[in-house]
Amino acid sequence: MSKRDYYQVLGVPRTASEDDLKKAYRRCAMKYHPDRNPGDAAAEAAFKECKEAYEVLADTKKRKLYDTHGHAAFEHGVGGGNAPDMNDIFGDIFGNIFGGARASRRGADVGYMVELDLEEAVAGVERQIQIPTLVECTHCNGSGSEDGHVETCGTCRGSGQVRIQRGIFAMQQTCPHCGGRGVIIRNPCKVCNGAGRVEDHKTLSVKIPAGVDNGDRIRLSGEGEQGPDGVPPGDLYVEVRVREHPIFQRDGDDLHCEVPVRISQAALGDIVRVATLDGEAEIRIPAETQSGKLFRLRGKGVRSVRSRTEGDLYCRIVVETPVNLTAEQRKLLEQFEMTFAGEDARKHSPKSATFLDGVKSFWDRMTS
């Protein structure tokens, strides 16, 4: 399940200040705190989500990483390669016990965040991106040696690992003499300082499929950092972030929008034109339509990136109160309002009548 954007979780814009973040987190925590919602698993999950979002965005360094790389910045192996590889750790300890060879290493995975408009996410798009990465040093051809000469480590005999006997257990660990490289470099390369890799930028063309949503990731195999000593490079993970749209809100493969109509249109009925992502469509509003009524346009949502089925567009009617009335319009409305006097009001406005009856009943009980 894709993680929600941290800014959306807290309900703040990407330009939010520290104070804005703190206030948003307090609101969220008060709303979803387990003590206020005992036994509510959904509230508990929402509380944890808010806490996780605030912990990242309230930390300047973490926020900068998140703004650049998205959720991938905090997942194992993505965005720098400083986290230890658990496969290597367990391979070092248990490799000889179970007879397994040292696991093949590779370069670190890299995370990159790409922002899309809703239209781009729905239709798919190809983007050129430039990413910082580590590539093989061309000066020493990745050897790390200025003169190209390297010596086989005498401690591990080139394997990069040493065998340690502890009681009945035979363990394998990274060679402390060569740091696991298996070689000793006496004359380090002046360009890469013996690392065999240098920092660089590379430009890639990324095809983003139609239907992607916030948090979706695209994996580009072998486009991550170059591994040390010629081992294969890692992968590049491109995480999608979709900008808010002025008209549509997305919910999975469905889209939602509000359609404002005049009082006369809602009362008498009308045909209203609405925007969709592929043009315009018409909604036939029946007479006496109330504000909040939903109309569904089948197949006018988003084509799923996974199942290739299409979602729907839900249009919510909002009856708009007229403003900036002329004297004539005001007079006509006053005359119209007078027609609701007496018992006719209950017939024409049943919800208002029911509400007033409820208020009267409440006060009668309070005063009795």
From Swiss-Prot:
Binds 2 Zn(2+) ions per monomer. It is found in: Cytoplasm. One of its GO terms (molecular function) is ATP binding. Residues 5-70 form the J domain. Its cofactor is Zn(2+). Pfam families: DnaJ, DnaJ_C, DnaJ_CXXCXGXG. Zn(2+) 1 binds at C137, C140, C189, C192. Zn(2+) 2 binds at C153, C156, C175, C178. CXXCXGXG motif repeats lie at residues 137-144, 153-160, 175-182, 189-196. One of its GO terms (cellular component) is cytoplasm. Keywords: Chaperone, Cytoplasm, DNA replication, Metal-binding, Repeat, Stress response, Zinc, Zinc-finger. A zinc finger (CR-type) spans 124-201. GO terms for biological process: chaperone cofactor-dependent protein refolding; DNA replication; protein refolding; response to heat. Participates actively in the response to hyperosmotic and heat shock by preventing the aggregation of stress-denatured proteins and by disaggregating proteins, also in an autonomous, DnaK-independent fashion. Unfolded proteins bind initially to DnaJ; upon interaction with the DnaJ-bound protein, DnaK hydrolyzes its bound ATP, resulting in the formation of a stable complex. GrpE releases ADP from DnaK; ATP binding to DnaK triggers the release of the substrate protein, thus completing the reaction cycle. The J domain is necessary and sufficient to stimulate DnaK ATPase activity. Zinc center 1 plays an important role in the autonomous, DnaK-independent chaperone activity of DnaJ. Zinc center 2 is essential for interaction with DnaK and for DnaJ activity. Belongs to the DnaJ family. NCBIfam families: DnaJ_bact, PRK10767.1. Homodimer. HAMAP family: DnaJ (MF_01152). This is Chaperone protein DnaJ. It comes from Xylella fastidiosa (strain M12).
